Amino acid sequence: MTNELLKDLEWRGLIYQQTDAEGLENILNKEQVTLYCGVDPTADSMHIGHLLPLLTLRRFQNHGHKPIVLIGGGTGMIGDPSGKTDERVLQTEEQVEQNVRGIGNQMDKIFDFSGKEAAQLVNNRDWLGKISLIDFLRDYGKHVGVNYMLGKDSVQSRLENGISYTEFTYMILQAIDFGHLNREYNCKVQIGGSDQWGNITSGIELMRRMYGQTEAYGITIPLVTKADGKKFGKSEAGTVWLDAEKTSPYELYQFWINTTDADVIKFLKYFTFLDKEEIERLEQSKEEAPHLREAQKALAENVVRFIHGEGALNDAIRISEALFSGDLKALSSDELREGFKDVPQAEVSNATTNIVDFIVEAGISSSKRQAREDVSNGAIYINGEREQDLKYEISEADKIDNEFTIVRRGKKKYFMVKYK
């Protein structure tokens, strides 16, 4: 019998590799399965690069299965070599603990921690921290061959540049995690990114050797790529975080709304819970009326609503619409700061009041002659209001919070002018 969940994951392109497709399908059809996905606390917030495996785990929860979210308070002290060309810098214990708390607090946004399919949050420091070196070598190291470990991509790719024994053993620690969750919670499936294949299969092999456990499975999801070859998960401002203090809901909305036509349908399949019928409708809209950007709006709205809630989404849309229309009066001073923090910044003297002198000093127009032309031609807007009077004086009323003024030149060129 075809499993509907696996069928949906295949359609979305979310299954990159799996250890035993037939065995996994059988257990998903006959029982409620417990699965897990791990996140190492490399920062005090997750970023959008963490989303895909976690959203895939959430899809299993939506279909009646039980997710375990593992935060690597133990493995985070070591550092995963997978996907890295250089040795990681070790974090302090205090930093790891702070990061564990920060990431743990974000899991409420992604998983449901109530009901029959309630998610569980665990920290592998709780069991890895209790294993002595002698126990590690006798109880676990004895079951893992060095040749087997050397054959894994995560290790092989590092041999030329060097890999420390610390990072070399990471694979065994993750294998211990899978075994622990299997014994304590009857967890049978691990989900991870494509770079986790070696770590996942090592866990399955360790369980087979130590406990004779053959009912354990692994799924990896694809690396998220963009059609233009650029790295996914970065904006011009840098990493796109899930913490609203690091990346505001407005910035998150802008990140997704700017998705290209070449990527948007794939990202709708990856990052939203919209069904096949709706995504196919959006794909048709993209082909027939690309200027409406309906697919991009659906992507941005669904992700921001899921991560930050309806209120934050509405604020993000309101800021976006106000900036697009130039109606800045609709925005608060904080929203203006938020919306314009990435535009060119300039400083002018508080004593400069004439509009021509003002826009020259701010570098908005290259000369007084150019400035006079810009003003006379209606190309200059002060806080969203067109100003064509060459004698206009910048007043206190133009200084938002007595701190800055938003100036627009032409249709789209914005500047934030501050006072000194």
UniProtKB/Swiss-Prot annotation:
Name any one GO molecular function: ATP binding
Q: Which PROSITE patterns match?
A: AA_TRNA_LIGASE_I (PS00178), S4 (PS50889)
BP-aspect Gene Ontology terms: tyrosyl-tRNA aminoacylation
**Record's InterPro entries?**
aa-tRNA-synth_I_CS, aa-tRNA-synth_Ic, Rossmann-like_a/b/a_fold, S4_RNA-bd, S4_RNA-bd_sf, SYY-like_C, Tyr-tRNA-ligase, Tyr-tRNA-ligase_bac-type
SUPFAM superfamilies, alphabetized: Alpha-L RNA-binding motif, Nucleotidylyl transferase
UniProt keyword annotations, A-Z: Aminoacyl-tRNA synthetase, ATP-binding, Cytoplasm, Ligase, Nucleotide-binding, Protein biosynthesis, RNA-binding
Q: Where is motif 'HIGH' region found?
A: 41-50
Where is the S4 RNA-binding domain positioned along the sequence?
353-420
Q: Where is this motif: 'KMSKS' region?
A: 231-235
User: EC number(s)?
Assistant: 6.1.1.1
Name of the protein described by the UniProt record? Tyrosine--tRNA ligase
What does the UniProt function comment say about this protein? Catalyzes the attachment of tyrosine to tRNA(Tyr) in a two-step reaction: tyrosine is first activated by ATP to form Tyr-AMP and then transferred to the acceptor end of tRNA(Tyr).
Show the GO cellular component annotation of the record.
Answer: cytosol
Q: Does the keyword Hydrolase apply?
A: no
* CDD domains for the chain: S4, Tyr_Trp_RS_core
Q: Where in the cell is it found?
A: Cytoplasm
Q: Which organism is it from?
A: Staphylococcus carnosus (strain TM300)
Task: Give the residues the record marks as binding L-tyrosine.
Answer: 36, 170, 174
Say which family it is in. Belongs to the class-I aminoacyl-tRNA synthetase family. TyrS type 1 subfamily.
Listed binding positions for ATP are: 234
The main location is cytoplasm
Query: What is annotated about its quaternary structure and interactions?
Result: Homodimer.
Q: Which reaction does it catalyse?
A: tRNA(Tyr) + L-tyrosine + ATP = L-tyrosyl-tRNA(Tyr) + AMP + diphosphate + H(+)
